[in-house]
């Protein structure tokens, strides 16, 4: 496993504190929410994958915010469809 330095990731985000927040959010997406990594996993942990994605400019706070907004919209649409189906007496 190659050693990951955070300097390139810090340069992409702007400061190390924001970089930590972005990396943690992305790692959580990969580990807990089951989001697919945008880079080869190479048997790395989600935190290392998140840092590599940041270094390559694939992930930043804006992209994470947009992804989370889309996830909420999708979840709400599914809930509305389920409620409509129940109200009409059919099942999904």
Curated annotation (Swiss-Prot):
One of its GO terms (cellular component) is DNA-directed RNA polymerase complex. Signal peptide: none annotated. InterPro entries: DNA-dir_RNA_pol_omega, Pol_omega/Rpo6/RPB6, RPB6/omega-like_sf. One of its GO terms (molecular function) is DNA binding. SMART domains: RNA_pol_Rpb6. It catalyses: RNA(n) + a ribonucleoside 5'-triphosphate = RNA(n+1) + diphosphate. The RNAP catalytic core consists of 2 alpha, 1 beta, 1 beta' and 1 omega subunit. When a sigma factor is associated with the core the holoenzyme is formed, which can initiate transcription. Promotes RNA polymerase assembly. Latches the N- and C-terminal regions of the beta' subunit thereby facilitating its interaction with the beta and alpha subunits. This is DNA-directed RNA polymerase subunit omega. It comes from Shewanella denitrificans (strain OS217 / ATCC BAA-1090 / DSM 15013). The gene is rpoZ.
């Amino acid at each position: 496993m190659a050693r990951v330095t955070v300097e390139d990731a810090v340069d992409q985000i702007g400061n190390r504190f924001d970089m930590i927040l972005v990396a943690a959010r992305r790692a959580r997406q990969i580990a807990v929410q089951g989001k697919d990594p945008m880079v080869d996993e190479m048997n790395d942990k989600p935190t290392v994958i998140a840092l590599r994605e940041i270094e390559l400019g694939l992930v930043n706070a804006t992209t994470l915010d947009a992804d989370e907004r889309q996830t909420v919209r999708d979840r709400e649409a599914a809930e509305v469809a389920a409620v409509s189906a129940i109200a009409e007496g059919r099942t999904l």
